[in-house]
Each structure stands twice: as C-alpha cells, then as structure tokens.
C-alpha cells in the first residue's frame, strides 16, 4: 500500500482502530466467528511465507527478489490453470509476453522497468464482459541491515488472489476474470497505471464492469473488521456488504474515517493503492484493506503475525463480489 497522508495524518493513524468502531456497520451485524466454505488457510499461509521469505528479500521492483517472486507466481498461475491473455484480445497482446506485462517508469531520477503478471479465466458461457482482481506483489526490498518482508503489504493480497483464482477455476463465473499481480505499486502505483493505460489504448477497458483491489488484508484492527472502500459509488453497497458479512463473519466497514477536530486530516484512501488508476479511467472499483498498523512498512511485517482465517474470509468475500450481477453495480 502506498500511503498518501495529508497534513498531521500520523496522529490519525494512531487512532484508526477507535475510529473503526464508529463506522456504519454495527456490532450486531458482524459474525461471532469467521465462516469459511472453500478457502484453504494452509495454502494461504504457504503463499505468504514464500513471498515474505528472506530468499525474496522484500520483493522490491527491479531486483532479484522481484524476479524470484515472479517465478513463483508464474508457477502458481500455471498450477491453478490461469491462461495468458495474449490470445484473447489482440490489440493488447503486443504489450504482453506470456503472463508478463512489462512497462517503464521513472523511480526518483532513474529509469526503471517493472513487470505485472496477468492471467485470466473464461466465463462459463461466452461473454464480452470482464471483471478484474488486482493485488500488488512488490514491496520495499532490502534497506540497510535486514529486509522488509511485506507479509501483510501485500503478500496477503496476492495469496488471496491465488486462492480466488483456484476457486473460479473450479466453479467458473458468468464473467471473464482477469487476475493481476501488479508491480511497482510502492513507488507510485506505476504497474496499475501502465496496465490501465494499455487497457484503455487497446479498447479493452470498455468491457470491464468491476475491478477489485486487495491490499493489506491480513491484520484486522478490530475482530474480523475489514474496510471496503468504494461505497460512495455503488447504489447497492449496503445490500451486498450485508450479504458478505452474513456469509463470512467479517465486519465490513466503509473506509471513510472522519477527521477529528480541526488539525487532523484523513488519509486519502482513494489514491492509496492500485484501485486509483481504475477510478481515474472511470472503471467501477472496490478495495479491501485494513488500516496501517504498527508493523506497516517495517521489518516486523512478517508471515507469523497474520490471521489466515481472516484472509480466507476476505478472499471469499472478494470472490462473491466478482460474481455480483451487473445490475448490482449501478452507481449512485
């Protein structure tokens, strides 16, 4: 997650858990326990542990750790049965090589190159409508003594993406689904920006009815609490969020904490992660994430600190969102 913080925002980060208690979802609407129907917590944990391991050295974009991450994710894409997008939409194919979508960006004063991974699954019946699921795999890398594991940010989201892909492979959707492990989110959302630009230039974007972003879904600040950003843009948000809570035991809350007093400004969650380029392109989006916690962007964001049943519940909720009938995605 790339945190865009307005003046004096760090004060608010310390009180976000308290703010969450005052969000619109009341306690009685939240389940007493996590309910899982298909998510496998052992596989989720295995994927996180690999991505957050010392061998991958924090997965900084452009490093050997990032290359090793892609090798692992490519193997997982193939195991699941995801297909490269190259043969589906010819205008987009020229930017792709297998699962890889390469792009250039400027990191500080240096030219840099990133690589997104894209795999797709066809709908149960032929359709031109697409849904997207995105989770960034890059993190901060190795800075000084030790590396930044990035277990919650964002190995948790990538592990959930893989779990959802496996589920959809077993039980196809009525929509084509594109799964994106994006690169260079941390330095400035460069992977998602490049991808959205390619989708627009190729004409692919007009076929997308929903993009779901998973970024930091492993450490609930309150029991079973997850923010689902994007509620301002969906007429039926309250209806489908209530259904997701009933089915998973999650406490789903709109991610709009109010400022307190005159001096505290709120986080700009709109620009905080890979959903923002989709927003700029006019593509409907929803974003699952937890607030920044004490281990955010530290060497202590490790795999052993995560709540894997919680990640599984978020994965199941996101999978249900990707199956929503288009009529439920109407804007306010």
Where are these regions (language model features)?
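His/Asp/Glu-rich mid-to-C-terminal helical/loop segments that flank catalytic regions of hydrolases
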Residues: 293-332
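Acidic/His- and Gly-rich active-site-bordering loop/insert found
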Residues: 51, 77, 105-144
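Second-shell loop/turn segments in exported
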Residues: 30-38, 54-64, 104-108, 145-154, ...
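A non-catalytic alpha/beta surface segment that caps or lines the substrate-entry region
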Residues: 59-121
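C-terminal motif of bacterial Sec signal peptides marking the signal peptidase cleavage site
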Residues: 20-22
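Alpha-helical metal-binding/catalytic segments enriched in His/Glu/Asp
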Residues: 119, 133-188, 318
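N-terminal capping segment at the start of a domain
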Residues: 27-68, 80-86, 100, 294-301
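Metal-dependent peptidase/peptidase-like ectodomains
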Residues: 182-287
